[in-house]
């Protein structure tokens, strides 16, 4: 005894009974791509598998294209409004993502002018972003991509 100090602190507080309600509201207000149909253009098998898994895990339906030409053809053959967004790799064989985007934008159908097209590329320099915009892409995301950022971008562009 006689060594040290003892403190007694009393802090009155109320127990938050609405915490569950707020957590549910936060979940609802969180960005979602559930139910969206996304055209995924990617020539690398592993990258395709990862992106497809991520998108499906977030509740999206995915159609796959392995090069720019295939992407243009899938979009051309689709019903107007069938796809909600296109995730476009840039460096692909047969036709790159820039050329594919220009071709899609030039198609004579209303949704071709407005469908969100998002560049997915390892090149994240300002000039790459500018080139994507010039080709008609709405947004640019660097690989490897952050899932929450990708979902946020798709949600923002679609809604």
Residue ranges of each PLM-predicted region?
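C-terminal compact regulatory domains
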Residues: 1-159
């Amino acid at each position: 005894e006689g060594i040290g100090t003892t403190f007694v602190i009393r802090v009155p507080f109320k127990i938050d009974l609405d915490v569950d309600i707020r957590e549910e509201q936060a979940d609802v207000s969180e960005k979602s791509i559930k139910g969206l149909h996304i055209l995924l253009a990617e020539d690398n098998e592993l990258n395709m598998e990862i992106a497809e898994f991520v998108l499906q895990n977030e509740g999206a339906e995915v159609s796959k294209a392995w090069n720019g030409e295939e992407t243009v053809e899938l979009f051309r053959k689709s019903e107007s409004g069938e796809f909600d967004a296109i995730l476009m790799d840039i460096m692909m064989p047969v036709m790159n993502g820039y050329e594919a985007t220009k071709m899609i934008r030039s198609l004579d159908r209303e949704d071709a002018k407005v469908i969100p097209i998002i560049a997915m590329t390892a090149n994240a320099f300002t000039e790459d972003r500018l080139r994507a915009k010039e080709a008609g892409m709405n947004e640019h995301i660097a690989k490897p991509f952050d899932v929450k950022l990708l979902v946020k971008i798709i949600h923002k562009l679609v809604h």
